[in-house]
Amino acid sequence: MNEYIVSARKYRPMKFSDVVGQDALTTTLRNTVKSGKLAHAYLFCGPRGVGKTTCARIFAKAINCEHPTDNGEACGACESCKAFEEGRSFNIFELDAASNNGVDQIKQLMEQTRIPPQVGRYKVFIIDEVHMLSQQAFNAFLKTLEEPPAHVIFILATTEKHKILPTILSRCQICLLYTSPSPRDPKTS
C-alpha cells in the first residue's frame, strides 16, 4: 500500500523559483542569501495559504546551504540541503505556536539557541502562528530575541501581525506576503 501524503505537502514548493505569486518576497530573500547580509529575525505576515511557512522553510534551507546557486537558491545536493529535505536537519527547528504556545515550550526552544550548529552556518528557528504565543511565552522569547547568539536566525510567521508585541515587531525584518489574484478566464474577459 502506498503511503498517503496530503497534496499540499506533496506539491509544496522546495525552492524559491517554485513559489507562485510572491515574486517580490522571493527576490528579496534570494538577494539576502546571495549577499550573506542576514537579519537575526524575520516576520512573514499574510493571510492563510499564501506560503508563509513554505517560504520560511525554503529560506531556512537556503541560509544553511553549503553551495548556494548564483541566484540565491539552495543547491539541493549538499549535506545540509539533503538533511533538511529528509527531515533530519539538526539546525532547523519548527514550532507550531498554535498548539505549543506556552512559556515552557518557548523556553525549551530557546535552550537550543545556546548550542552552535553542527552542520551549516546557522541554527534557524521557524515559529509558525507566532501570534498564538501566550504573554509569558512572548516575554521569554523576547529575552533571546533582544540579544541572540550570532549563529541564530528566527523566522516568525503570522496571519495576525497586530497581535504581536511592538517590542517583538521592532526587532524583526517584516516581510509581507499577499494573495495572488486569480487567473482570469479568457472566455469571460
Name these PLM-found stretches:
Residues M1-I174:
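P-loop/Walker A NTP-binding region and its immediately flanking N-terminal helices
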